[in-house]
């Protein structure tokens, strides 16, 4: 499978033409272009991951205590408006903000790997690990950090993932949501 980057407007148009859950971008484009579409029935997921809503479903699980070393004031430094404006699209802004978070707390950044959907892996230490979890993950490296993130989520999901990461690092939820809105 090949990967291409498309702008936000084109992405939204393609996504709006989805007819069934799990339909790939290739299937949608084939249908729109009048090309043959394989009618292989894909397995439907049992649940769709929504990080911002998953906290509402309590599940007993071990949650390690994480020491946070980033002062609340430092989170305001996370957003360099000039550099953020130079990023290309939502994916670029998402990656830039994650890399900025890494710069604030390099030693504890590995805790970001704990952020996962119910059946979805969002962060990993390698591209291959994300592709193994989902062939359509479209993994991107977070700067030169050695950490990778899946980018095939819509902008709202990217915002929810970023906000969850910020809160995990000790950021106030209101500040985290404000920063995430910049994606």
Swiss-Prot record:
One GO-annotated biological process of the protein: regulation of DNA-templated transcription
Primary site of residence: cytoplasm
Protein's cellular compartments: Cytoplasm
Keywords: Cytoplasm, DNA replication inhibitor, DNA-binding
Gene Ontology cellular-component terms listed: cytoplasm
Native source organism of the sequence: Shewanella oneidensis (strain ATCC 700550 / JCM 31522 / CIP 106686 / LMG 19005 / NCIMB 14063 / MR-1)
Function: Negative regulator of replication initiation, which contributes to regulation of DNA replication and ensures that replication initiation occurs exactly once per chromosome per cell cycle. Binds to pairs of hemimethylated GATC sequences in the oriC region, thus preventing assembly of replication proteins and re-initiation at newly replicated origins. Repression is relieved when the region becomes fully methylated.
Subunit structure, interactors included: Homodimer. Polymerizes to form helical filaments.
Molecular function GO terms recorded: DNA binding
Protein name per its UniProtKB record: Negative modulator of initiation of replication
Segments of this protein annotated with the region Interaction with DNA: 90-91
Similarity comment text for this entry: Belongs to the SeqA family.
């Amino acid at each position: 499978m090949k990967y291409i980057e498309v702008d936000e407007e084109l992405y939204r148009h393609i996504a709006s033409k989805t007819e069934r859950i799990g339909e790939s971008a290739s299937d949608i484009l084939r249908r729109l272009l009048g090309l043959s579409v394989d009618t292989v029935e894909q397995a439907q997921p049992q649940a769709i991951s929504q990080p911002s809503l998953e906290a509402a479903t309590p599940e007993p699980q071990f949650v390690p205590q994480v020491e946070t070393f980033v002062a609340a004031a430092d989170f305001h430094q996370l957003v360099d408006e000039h550099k953020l404006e130079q990023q290309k699209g939502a994916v670029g802004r998402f990656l830039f903000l994650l890399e900025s978070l890494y710069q604030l707390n390099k030693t504890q950044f590995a805790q970001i790997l704990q952020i996962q959907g119910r059946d979805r892996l969002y962060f990993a230490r390698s591209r291959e690990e994300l592709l193994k979890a989902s062939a359509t993950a479209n993994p991107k490296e977070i700067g030169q950090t050695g950490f990778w993130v899946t980018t095939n989520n819509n902008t709202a999901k990217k915002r929810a993932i970023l906000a969850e990461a910020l809160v995990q690092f000790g950021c106030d939820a209101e500040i985290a949501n404000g920063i995430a809105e910049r994606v």
